[in-house]
């Protein structure tokens, strides 16, 4: 009887220790990924944007920070109320990653029937890229001034 009790207690202790170790290492995963040089992508829309060709396009400044290998794709969409309608546009650029904040200007051409005008607009920027192990993307939405 005593031998069976000792076996049960020993089994319970081992199970608790193994479970604790698994829980400890499982929660360390994201920290290990962060400190081991994983993929980092960040894009920030900046203001003001510059109106071009009587509203046919705007130049939108963005700040790009990344550590992807090769180049990353940065796309920007601008939406603005224009009279009784909506002006919209899209533009993109390929950017090399330098590891620190890099200023990039993206040309956004109006795609709707309405031209852009001076004033407030909503800009959405997305960055996407890959390193040797993984791919990812990040997005930023901002209200900007078009001047």
For the regions a protein language model found, what residue spans apply to each?
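Short beta-strand elements
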Residues: 132-147
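Short proline/glycine- and polar residue-rich coil/turn motifs
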Residues: 53, 93-103
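Short, surface-exposed binding/anchoring microloops in extracellular/periplasmic proteins
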Residues: 38-83
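Short aromatic-acidic-glycine turn motif
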Residues: 79-90, 130
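C-terminal region of N-terminal signal peptides and the immediate post-cleavage residues
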Residues: 23-40
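Bacterial N-terminal signal peptides that target proteins for export
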Residues: 2-15
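Short glycine/proline/serine/threonine-rich loop/turn segments at secondary-structure transition edges
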Residues: 112-122
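Bacterial N-terminal signal peptides
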Residues: 13-26
């Amino acid at each position: 009887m005593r031998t069976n009790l000792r076996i049960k207690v020993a089994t319970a202790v081992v199970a608790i220790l193994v479970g604790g170790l698994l829980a400890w290492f499982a929660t360390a995963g994201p920290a290990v990924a962060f400190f081991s040089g994983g993929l980092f992508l960040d894009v920030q829309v900046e203001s003001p944007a510059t109106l071009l060709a009587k509203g046919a396009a705007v130049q939108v400044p963005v700040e790009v920070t990344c550590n992807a290998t090769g180049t990353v794709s940065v796309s920007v969409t601008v939406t603005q109320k224009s009279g009784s309608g909506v002006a919209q546009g899209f533009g993109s650029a390929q950017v090399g990653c330098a590891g620190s904040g890099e200023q990039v200007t993206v040309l956004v051409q109006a795609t709707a029937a309405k031209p852009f005008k001076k004033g407030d607009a909503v800009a959405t920027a997305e960055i996407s890229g890959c390193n040797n192990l993984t791919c990812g993307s990040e997005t930023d939405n901002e209200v900007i001034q078009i001047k």
